[in-house]
């Protein structure tokens, strides 16, 4: 009977940004800035086919890309480029993955099952089996934040294996448990395998991988260094570990630096060239070239954004900046959006507005002592420019520079005017609020 293809990856890559500031993270959304932000390639072109009923071990040193590969297969992390084909429902088990620290173990069981689309009746029917399998006992009603790593792994494993997934991804979940629970988990995994389910087993334990897995993928600093039968791959891996463990500490550090440097300096162009060289431009090379370009085309969030989307994002950022400035300046949002030109002038040109009339007479905010004193001052120093024609009463014209905290009513009151009179002299304040630095015309009315 021919086995069904369950998982296929073609030239999977995963690039992570090493941006340290928010501005750098924002730059990664736009291709014009992307080359200026350092990156790190956790995967550098991983291709493998996995069939139903297979248990695949994923091994490698720390930082080799094991968890990144398992997260992409489980749908947690999107790939940067390459093709991923999944035929079936995937469930991932890692230490504490998806658990809410503030909820109890029992509440986490219900929450995760609900998130997977199960109904309360279905959950009630199997929650006791999950609790019994987890071996947590009375601790099932304690907050998960009080659990040890082994207890968290037991809970996560118990929930996942009771979901009946087609593809099970186990990321170090059995490495922290005791031998009794490991044997129970192993028995469950073998039962899944007999049912034709596919299992990905990520582990540092060569013994566990040797006991469980049919084939092994050896990850090495983002590369799939080898993929094949467990016996042959583990023989190569043990030989590598023997050499590596005999390195001095400086030699190990140098080896790790070289591997990580290659991950930082990797590019999709390099991957294209390497694959095309292997193809040797044989018959059908045009098709091969087309496929290689397709699978090595970056598929990042910023590249998916259309010009319109990017323009909208820039507009949104400008709007946030504009609203922030109006808030700092004490301008209402209604005014800011109804009269944007005047608002921008208030925000960016207050000093210039204040300096329009350097010879203007700046009056104080205090109310004049009396109309009589004003009349005496006018009689002593009459000004022909301050006496309008065809007016029976004497009037003095002056200016006032608006200060912080002023209002139209306060200025009018302090200078013996009504609001209507002040608005008549300064019609621009009828619709647009006053702002600090604005120069207003005043006419103090006297009898």
Curated annotation (Swiss-Prot):
Its EC number is 7.5.2.4. Residues 24-246 form the ABC transporter domain. Residues 398-442 form the LysM domain. InterPro entries: AAA+_ATPase, ABC_transporter-like_ATP-bd, ABC_transporter-like_CS, ABC_transpr_TagH-like, Bact_Polysacc_Export_ATP-bd, LysM_dom, LysM_dom_sf, P-loop_NTPase. It is an enzyme of class 7 (translocase). Residues 359-393 are annotated as: Disordered. It is a peripheral membrane protein. The keyword Transport applies. Keywords: ATP-binding, Cell membrane, Membrane, Nucleotide-binding, Translocase, Transport. CDD domains: ABC_KpsT_Wzt (cd03220), LysM (cd00118). Its main location: membrane. It comes from the Bacteria. Residues 360-369, 379-393 have a biased composition (Polar residues). ATP binds at residues 60-67. It is found in: Cell membrane. Residues 247-447 are annotated as: Unknown. Part of the ABC transporter complex TagGH involved in teichoic acids export. Responsible for energy coupling to the transport system. Belongs to the ABC transporter superfamily. Teichoic acids exporter (TC 3.A.1.104.1) family. The complex is composed of two ATP-binding proteins (TagH) and two transmembrane proteins (TagG). This is Teichoic acids export ATP-binding protein TagH. The lineage of its organism: Bacteria, Bacillati, Bacillota, Bacilli, Lactobacillales. The gene is tagH.
């Amino acid at each position: 009977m021919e086995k069904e293809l369950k998982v296929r990856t073609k030239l999977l890559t995963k690039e992570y940004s090493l941006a340290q500031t928010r501005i750098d993270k924002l730059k990664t959304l736009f291709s014009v800035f992307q080359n200026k932000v350092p990156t790190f390639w956790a995967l550098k072109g991983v291709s493998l086919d996995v069939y139903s009923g297979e248990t695949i071990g994923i091994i490698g040193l720390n930082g080799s890309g094991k968890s990144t590969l398992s997260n992409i297969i489980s749908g947690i992390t999107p790939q940067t480029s390459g093709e991923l084909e999944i035929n079936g429902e995937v469930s991932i088990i890692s230490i504490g993955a998806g658990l809410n620290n503030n909820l109890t173990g029992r509440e986490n069981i219900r929450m995760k099952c609900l998130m997977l689309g199960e109904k309360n009746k279905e959950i009630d029917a199997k929650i006791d089996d999950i609790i019994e399998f987890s071996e947590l006992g009375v601790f099932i009603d304690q907050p998960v934040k009080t659990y040890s790593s082994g207890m968290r792994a037991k809970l996560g494993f118990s929930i996942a294996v009771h979901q009946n997934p087609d593809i099970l991804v186990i990321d170090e979940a059995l490495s922290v448990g005791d031998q009794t629970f490991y044997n129970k988990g192993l028995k469950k995994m073998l039962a899944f395998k007999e049912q034709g389910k596919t299992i990905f087993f990520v582990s540092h334990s060569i013994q566990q991988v040797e006991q469980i897995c049919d084939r092994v993928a050896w990850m090495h600093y983002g590369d799939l260094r080898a993929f094949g039968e467990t016996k042959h791959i583990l023989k190569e891996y043990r030989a590598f570990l023997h050499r590596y463990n005999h390195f001095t500490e400086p030699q190990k550090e140098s080896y790790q630096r070289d591997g990580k440097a290659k991950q930082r300096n990797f590019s999709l162009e390099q991957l294209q060239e390497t694959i095309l060289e292997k193809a040797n431009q044989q018959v059908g090379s045009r098709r091969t070239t087309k496929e290689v370009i397709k699978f090595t085309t970056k598929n990042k969030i910023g590249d998916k954004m259309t010009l319109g989307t990017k323009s909208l994002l820039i507009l949104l950022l400008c709007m946030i900046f504009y609203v922030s400035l109006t808030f700092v300046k004490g301008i209402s949002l209604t005014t800011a959006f109804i009269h944007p030109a005047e608002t921008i002038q208030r925000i960016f040109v207050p000093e210039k507005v204040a300096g329009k009339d350097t010879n203007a007479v700046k009056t104080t905010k205090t109310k004049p002592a009396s109309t009589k004193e004003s009349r005496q001052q006018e009689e002593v120093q009459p000004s022909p420019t301050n006496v309008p024609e065809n007016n029976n009463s004497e009037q003095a014209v002056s200016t006032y520079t608006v200060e912080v905290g002023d209002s139209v009513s306060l200025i009018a009151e302090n200078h013996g005017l009504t609001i209507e009179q002040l608005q008549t002299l300064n019609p621009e304040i009828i619709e647009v609020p006053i702002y600090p630095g604005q120069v207003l015309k005043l006419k103090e009315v006297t009898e």
